[in-house]
Curated annotation (Swiss-Prot):
High-level lineage: Bacteria, Bacillati, Bacillota, Tissierellia, Tissierellales
Localisation: Cytoplasm
Similarity field: Belongs to the DTD family.
Protein's recorded name: D-aminoacyl-tRNA deacylase
Organism: Finegoldia magna (strain ATCC 29328 / DSM 20472 / WAL 2508)
Assembly behavior: Homodimer.
Length: 148
């Protein structure tokens, strides 16, 4: 499982011209699911995500987490995070989880994130979404359960 985490001042997801979700300060998280991911990958990624200290404290050190500040998360499924560009110029999606398997893991990720009492919103799995954001920093971090 791979998370691309961007620290944002605001982010939103539009579907068919209608805003589905919008946050202010927090994380825009793009979630990629590998074809071999399981529940332990979800647990690892959520633990890292909510405790990731990439917000500045009073000494301007990156020392505070989203949980410390009660900031929000906007979670968006992004199967292309596991695209491979090793051969040729067209990406291969062989490592990406497919269909119902990916949807089940995405739904389980959401269920487990709810248990952490961190405010969050989501995009819509499988939808054609327009995602917009204002980066803060910018600060962008990749959390990858396959390289723990």
């Amino acid at each position: 499982m791979k998370l691309l985490v961007q620290r944002v001042n605001e982010a939103k997801v539009d579907i068919n011209g209608i805003t589905k979700s919008k946050i202010n300060d927090g994380f825009l998280v793009l979630l990629g699911i590998h074809k071999e991911d399981n529940e332990s990958d979800i647990d690892y990624c959520i633990r890292k995500l909510i405790n990731l200290r990439i917000f500045s404290d009073e000494d301007d050190k990156l020392n505070l987490s989203i949980k410390d500040l009660n900031y929000e998360i906007l979670l968006v499924s992004q199967f292309t995070l596991y695209a491979s560009t090793r051969k040729g110029n067209r990406p291969s999606f062989d490592k990406c989880a497919k269909g119902e398997f990916a949807k089940n893991l995405y739904d389980n990720f959401i269920k487990k994130l709810k248990l952490e009492n961190v405010p969050f919103q989501t995009g819509e799995f499988g939808a054609d979404m327009k995602v917009s954001l204002t980066n803060d920093g910018p600060v962008t971090i990749i959390i990858d359960s396959r390289s723990e």
